Amino acid sequence: MFMPPVFPAHWHVSQPVLIADTFSSLVWKVSLPDGTPAIVKLKPIEDIADELRGADYLVWRNGRGAVRLLGRENNLMLLEYAGERMLSHIVAEHGDYQATEIAAELMAKLYAASEEPLPSALLPIRDRFAALFQRARDDQNAGCQTDYVHAAIIADQMMSNASELRGLHGDLHHENIMFSSRGWLVIDPVGLVGEVGFGAANMFYDPADRDDLCLDPRRIAQMADAFSRALDVDPRRLLEAYAYGCLSAAWNADGEEEHAI
């Protein structure tokens, strides 16, 4: 049985129960002194960069559409408990349309213009796309006009013509959107900065096990319409964010762990 680490004494947490053990993190549900549940998350040191950016993102959000960061020590984070009900449950129980409307409403809150300055630690979206740009250069040098080349051109144009940069969650999908005592919140941000349209891109490819949805042109159009209204973005720019799919493919082709935006 895996024993939890020694949690910082000033957190005053008790009754740890391991609820997730993945390649990327260990997660315990704990109790705060008043009995309120909370989460302690441990990230491997080699994977700490994304987590630190994500922590800065949560501090910046200060509970607005996202779980609250209650404390952090090295690679340990103490987080607000977000419940157990995910947006994927809404898809299964009430249908994809309702889930999309929930996601759109949450993104409108999450990606609204903020008077708070963006954290300097957030990763520029262009840096996140480095693998796609490299794959496109390799294909062009080989004389091949591939989907990677086309997607890289679109991504570069979107980044170069971005009207306003926003703080982005960086890994928004149906299992990172949770129904808590405060309503729908996001968990596990990566922490990026870029055009708001990129913040919705991953949703078109999710749920990951539902190709019947992800490949349905009517669903894609409905999502683009819902997200464009929520984010006040031209739906064509949202659809151009399909470049994310080629980025994910480039990561997988290079044998890297899949990321998201």
Residue spans for each PLM region:
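Conserved NTP-binding catalytic cores of kinases and kinase-like/nucleotidyltransferase enzymes
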Residues: 1-66, 180-183
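Regulatory N- and C-terminal appendages and interdomain linkers associated
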Residues: 1-16, 54, 141-149, 219, ...
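An alpha-helical support segment within catalytic cores of ATP-dependent transferases
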Residues: 2-7, 115-170, 180, 229
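Active-site acidic catalytic loop and adjacent metal/ATP-binding pocket
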Residues: 26-32, 39, 69, 153-198
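A conserved alpha-helical element in kinase catalytic cores
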Residues: 36-80, 85-110
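A glycine-centered beta->alpha junction motif in the catalytic cores
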Residues: 45, 76-96, 112-116, 130-141, ...
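Active-site Asp-x-Gly
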Residues: 179-225, 229-232
